[in-house]
Amino acid sequence: MKIVADENLAFTDYFFSEFGDIQYKAGRTLTHTDVQDAEALLVRSVTAVNESLIQNTALKYVGSATIGTDHLDIQALEKQGITWANAAGCNAQAVAEYVITALLHLDASLLEQQEKFTLGIVGLGNVGKRLAYMAQLLGWKVIGFDPYVQLDSIENVSFQTLLQQANAVSIHVPLTKKGEHATYHLFDEKAFAALQPNTILINSARGPVVKEAALIEDIQRTQRKVVLDVFEHEPVISEELLNMLALATPHIAGYSLEGKARGTQMIYEAFCQKFGYDINKRFETQLPACEDYFSGHDLKAVLKQKLSQIYDIAQDDANIRACVKEGKVEQKAFDLLRKNYPLRREWAAHGGPQA
């Protein structure tokens, strides 16, 4: 069997080499010719899997080792009779830890604020519910908005109420452009007007959920602290926007070693189900041991002392800013940051909590 795989997927050889010949390709520039005689295609979110890519091919299976599906033309896949799978929730823990790291980097005193600090979570799916759990471990008050999901463990409120009450807002919705609850430009001029000026905003979901022009106007007006891991015009990012952000990272919020490995394992399991193979591999057997920071210690004390050793978000911020050339970060530089990213470990690898 011929398998075409994104060159940046983790542990592809471990999971798939026994099944056939793996050909590695750059995901963003994948062509119909690349996949024409392949039976399986393994991708990330940078590959648009659409009708022009998949029609008149030998493809029987497409697996995306990512949580989202907005890059997959599901209708076209099903029309062609191609089985597809994604990896919903694979990196949810990593994203939740990213958000908490960003908040504590901006204000370490949040560790002492308990319920004086209110975190508003927009989207209560795989990431949102884990973030709620982790935030409550720190004693924070958590409110959430999701038109489809309610969590018993938090106060569920309207979007407008969340914008007005939260000290920080973290976005965890898929990108959708149709329907009553479309998320495209969910954060527009109206939403920013409802936010308190000192409310922190974090987007680690999908770039176009936040309308960039409205965001720039808002920061100019309020001096708001904003953290972006995703961008509306990604992979190109303007220097003007970067200079306004409190923290910027190159779409790596979910880039933990565990998250990457878990994503590949999930599409491996779907692959095995499709082709009738036994599922007999686990990513945990491939991970190196880590130094234990948390066991037997107070969670807040460890985060106060070891946060930058667990994940140095300031270095990621510095790296993306160093890529600015002629007023912007170009696609090539952005993609290289992601390709060469030193995958961090989740807190649990250091003996810490996990949602």
Curated annotation (Swiss-Prot):
Major enzyme class: oxidoreductase
Superkingdom classification of source: Bacteria
GO MF entries: 4-phosphoerythronate dehydrogenase activity; NAD binding; protein dimerization activity
Keyword Glycoprotein among UniProt keywords: no
Reactions catalysed, as given in the entry: 4-phospho-D-erythronate + NAD(+) = (R)-3-hydroxy-2-oxo-4-phosphooxybutanoate + NADH + H(+)
Catalytic site positions: R206, E234, H251 (proton donor)
Alphabetical UniProt keywords: Cytoplasm, NAD, Oxidoreductase, Pyridoxine biosynthesis
Positions that bind substrate: S45, T66, Y255
Annotated Gene Ontology cellular component terms: cytoplasm
InterPro entries: D-iso_2-hydroxyacid_DH_PdxB, D-isomer_2_OHA_DH_cat_dom, D-isomer_DH_CS1, D-isomer_DH_NAD-bd, Erythronate-4-P_DHase, Erythronate-4-P_DHase_dimer, NAD(P)-bd_dom_sf, PdxB_dimer_sf
Entry's EC annotation: 1.1.1.290
Family the UniProt entry places it in: Belongs to the D-isomer specific 2-hydroxyacid dehydrogenase family. PdxB subfamily.
Subunit structure of this chain's protein: Homodimer.
Function summary: Catalyzes the oxidation of erythronate-4-phosphate to 3-hydroxy-2-oxo-4-phosphonooxybutanoate.
Name under which the protein is recorded: Erythronate-4-phosphate dehydrogenase
Higher taxonomy: Bacteria, Pseudomonadati, Pseudomonadota, Gammaproteobacteria, Moraxellales
Gene: pdxB
